[in-house]
């Protein structure tokens, strides 16, 4: 869970608890003030009854007591009215000083007003906190959106770069294939005395026939190959080497003047054997190759 969210919930719960405590304390203070007021009123009534009894016995003392009672009643009534108007600013039953609180300017204020000001301040702080929280969430969301935009832009740039790279590779491959094609055609441009060079479709047919002959016979004698296509042995070897380099055929030339064609499947079988065995000797490779590579033409094998 988000730590900031947990902190927000904690602050909110603390603020609500503080407000409830303030309200309960205010009710308790008001109840205590009413009780003290009732007690003072009862004391005032008892004092008045005593003065009246003394006034009935002594006429001269009655007037003096009446005047004192009036003055005392006025003072006590003023004190009671003051307590009724402001329940916070009252004396304790034991004669203690009145309870006050002070605002930010140092002025004395009653507890009820102080509680209201405190609640108002807490609400203001809570609103400010909520505003800051919304602004912070908005800022984080904007940052995440900006990061997503940057990532999308980077992905698009990478895709374009990859497409451009593939396009260049494709163009380069097509160019090389075309050059190889032209080179192969040139290799079969057989010139004879009194005749023109063989070009076009006829040269392509000669290339195809040459490659098919090697693949079909599997083990090709160079002399037979040169005789079959009307070439010198050296030219036949050169052209065979050229086709090997171009990837049209693949195989090995032995020291007896024979070329052994190896198919893709046979190459894969030998590579699989090496990968499975791990470290192998040349003798083991040669022995396994003799078993995996077919040295007979399909017709001879049948």
Curated annotation (Swiss-Prot):
It holds the Pfam family DDRGK. Residues 118-178 have a biased composition (Basic and acidic residues). It is found in: Endoplasmic reticulum membrane. Residues 22-302 are cytoplasmic. Residues 101-178 are annotated as: Disordered. GO terms for molecular function: ubiquitin-like protein ligase binding. SUPFAM superfamilies: Winged helix' DNA-binding domain. GO terms for cellular component: endoplasmic reticulum membrane; nucleus. It comes from the Eukaryota. The chain crosses the membrane at residues 1-21. InterPro entries: DDRGK_dom-contain, DDRGK_domain-containing, WH-like_DNA-bd_sf, WH_DNA-bd_sf. It is a single-pass membrane protein. Gene3D superfamilies: Winged helix-like DNA-binding domain superfamily/Winged helix DNA-binding domain (1.10.10.10). Disulfide bonds: none annotated. Its main location: endoplasmic reticulum. Keywords: Endoplasmic reticulum, Membrane, Transmembrane, Transmembrane helix, Ubl conjugation pathway. Substrate adapter for ufmylation, the covalent attachment of the ubiquitin-like modifier ufm-1 to substrate proteins. Belongs to the DDRGK1 family. This is DDRGK domain-containing protein 1.
């Amino acid at each position: 869970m988000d730590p900031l969210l947990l902190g927000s919930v904690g602050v909110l719960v603390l603020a609500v608890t503080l407000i409830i405590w303030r309200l309960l304390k205010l009710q308790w203070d008001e109840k205590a003030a009413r009780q003290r007021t009732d007690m003072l009123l009862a004391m005032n009534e008892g004092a008045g009854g005593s003065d009246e009894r003394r006034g009935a016995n002594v006429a001269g003392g009655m007037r003096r007591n009446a005047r004192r009672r009036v003055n005392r009643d006025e003072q006590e009534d003023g004190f009671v009215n003051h307590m009724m108007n402001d329940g916070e600013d009252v004396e304790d039953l034991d004669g203690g000083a009145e309870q006050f609180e002070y605002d930010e300017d140092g002025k004395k204020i009653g507890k009820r007003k102080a509680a209201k000001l405190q609640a108002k301040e807490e609400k203001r702080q809570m609103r400010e906190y909520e505003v800051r929280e919304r602004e912070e969430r908005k800022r984080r969301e904007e940052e995440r959106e900006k990061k997503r935009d940057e990532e999308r832009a980077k992905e698009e740039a990478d895709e374009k770069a990859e497409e451009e790279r593939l396009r260049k590779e494709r163009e380069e491959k097509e160019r090389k294939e075309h050059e190889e094609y032209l080179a192969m055609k040139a290799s079969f441009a057989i010139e004879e005395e009194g005749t023109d060079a063989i070009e076009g479709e006829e040269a392509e047919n000669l290339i195809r026939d040459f490659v098919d002959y090697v693949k079909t016979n599997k083990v090709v004698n160079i002399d037979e190959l040169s005789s079959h296509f009307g070439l010198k042995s050296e030219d036949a070897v050169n052209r065979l080497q050229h086709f090997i380099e171009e990837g049209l055929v693949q195989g090995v030339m032995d020291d007896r003047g024979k070329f052994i064609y190896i198919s893709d499947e046979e190459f894969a079988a030998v590579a699989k054997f090496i990968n499975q065995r791990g470290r192998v000797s040349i003798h083991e490779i040669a022995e396994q190759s003799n078993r995996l590579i077919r040295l007979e033409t399909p017709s001879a094998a049948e």
